[in-house]
Amino acid sequence: MKVSHWLIPLALATAWPIQSLQAQTQEASTQAPKLVVSIVVDQMRADYLTRFEDLYTGGIQTLMSEGESFINAHYSHAPTYTGPGHATIYTGTDPRFHGIIANDWYDASLKRSVYCVEDDQVAPVGSSSDAHRRSPKNIRSTTWTDELEWATQGKAKVIAFSIKDRGAICAAGHYGDAAYWIDSDAGFVSSSHYMDDLPKWMMRFNRSHDPSSYMTGSWDRLLDVSHYDALAGPDQSDFERVPKGAKSATFPYDLKAMQSAYNGAFKSTPAGNTLLVDAALVAVKAEGLGQDDITDVLAISFSATDYLGHAMGPRSQEVMDMYLRLDLDLKHLFESLDLLVGKGNYLVTFTADHGASDNPMQAKADGFPAELWAPADLEAELRVLMHLALIDNDKVLNLSNDQIYLSSREKDLAVAVRNAILVHPAIAEAWTWEEIRLSPDPYAQLRRNGSDKRSGQVFYALKPGHLAYGPTGTTHGSGYHYDSHVPLIFMGKAFNPQAMHNERAYIRDMAPTLSKVIGIASPSACTGNPLWVSPANK
């Protein structure tokens, strides 16, 4: 269990770059809300806002009509994954400084991959599985939620929910009150970093809201099929993965059969989103979030959109329908918060941790330049090229995250590897870490993600539309627009309804924006810039 959770260690409080010692206090901001609702939709491309705009009638429509939108918001790093994306949202800096360079990375000293939120020094809470030994120890910066705890001497309540552990932990930060994520058997769980035992209200929720209880009946299209035919691809597609327990990747789906075949099936259906909203609203009531003048935080990372996106791809009718149903889940969330906290008393942020590519084979069939490699095949082919360049295989420790880890940091070895792989038809460009570290743009995205201790010695970028993945669904990770461009909306009394900004904004700007609105210091490694100007200065 956390000890004096608002006493931030010196190592985090002084992380580079050093913040002003004259920290703002929460009382300095007249715009501070009673509750910040931080929403992240995993794998939501920016074009999902406009593509389905005429069909949104709920929470997403409310965000677009009542929020202030930054329609050219991007991640400034690559690779673009869930871990780095969430860490960037909450720390206000890039992976180079917050340290979460990928969902996992190779550690040469341990001779294995390290998961971004793994921690064998903590115990699982709510489950006996070692898979839930998780904490934020690998995040090198404070988060804006940490700074809120610091500014209020621990009086603020910070509670985060996600299906994925990393989605909740990056939001709760080092000193949040709770991070909850899903175990398919036990329900919501946490770790001893945040608590000794699940609170009684969560135990009751897990007993009464087993994930399988959401998987009854059938999942069919919310609207008439004509809408889906107009805005998505055909329902029958060779580029979509058939779920376990289903006969085909077409509507309608027998949810009970899917859940019986695989107890994690709910994670890739709209039920996964509904479960999170239900749990979050119980937490608001049980923990009294937003009930006094000290700003609290409710963070929700919707993971089902990512699970489904990986299986079906962005042109699928299933993905389209999930977003239309998420729109209704968010409507329920906002209407409930209007009653529980008061309309105008809470601030909402809305973004995504990354986008997604079209399925390369689907794009290729439609005449676009694209190609697909099985990940194992691409690695094998790159190793052959290095072998042909007389590079010993034992000098190549690992290939992951579009990086190559070598047994030494010799410049000549890295250059030889770079030159060897450049001839592969999937590779657009390759660089040594030294080249990236010392050079300006166009290496900026990679430089912002690189870390002397956690990154490889050679980086490479696949060509646009080229993926190392399976034949169905899609993935993400590049620095191209389809992966970096995401929604960014702020909704609350501090922001201008329906205001729309075309200039480039970065997701690392979110944390300093919220810090300024709330009246707290920015996170310790923050490199972003506030997007908000006080009404008094407009």
Predicted feature locations:
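Active-site regions of oxyanion-processing enzymes, predominantly non-cytosolic
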Residues: V36, W150, K155-S162, A168-A171, ...
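Secreted, luminal/periplasmic, and some membrane-associated catalytic domains
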Residues: Y81, N103-R133, S141, D146, ...
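Non-catalytic, well-ordered alpha-helical segments in soluble enzyme domains
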Residues: T62, S141-W150, N401-W431, K493, ...
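Active-site-proximal N-terminal segment of extracellular/periplasmic enzymes that hydrolyze or transfer
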Residues: Q24-E68
